[in-house]
From Swiss-Prot:
Belongs to the eukaryotic/archaeal RNase P protein component 2 family. GO terms for biological process: tRNA 5'-leader removal. GO terms for cellular component: multimeric ribonuclease P complex; nucleolus. Disulfide bonds: none annotated. Its main location: nucleus. It comes from Mus musculus (Mouse). RNase P consists of a catalytic RNA moiety and about 10 protein subunits; POP1, POP4, POP5, POP7, RPP14, RPP21, RPP25, RPP30, RPP38 and RPP40. Within the RNase P complex, POP1, POP7 and RPP25 form the 'finger' subcomplex, POP5, RPP14, RPP40 and homodimeric RPP30 form the 'palm' subcomplex, and RPP21, POP4 and RPP38 form the 'wrist' subcomplex. All subunits of the RNase P complex interact with the catalytic RNA. This is Ribonuclease P protein subunit p14.
Amino acid sequence: MPATAYERVVYKSPSEYHYMKVCLEFQEHGVGLNVAQFKQLLVSALRDLFGEVGAALPVDVLTYDEKTLSAILRICSSGLVKLWSSLTLFGAYKSKKCAFRVIQVSPFLLALSGNSREQVLD
């Protein structure tokens, strides 16, 4: 009786980019960042974990809210895991403890426009 042959199939994401909705939380209140400082924070988080190669990843800040320190980021799909892990491990900005919270991730920007858990159906 012949053995059954198994074939491993890996499907790569057809999407060129992934979008992340993130929020930056500080332990102390009253810390403010403009969009340029926020972008620099992302690059330094990537540099801390992955060196200059990580810092060279193309990350775009599509929207940024200075009041809530939240943003929607666009990253090439191949760099998603690197960005996510560097944000997770980032812990301080100018000697002030902080943490990135990843709220949503999707290959579709439209998916980040609303939250289905808060949707009211009539």
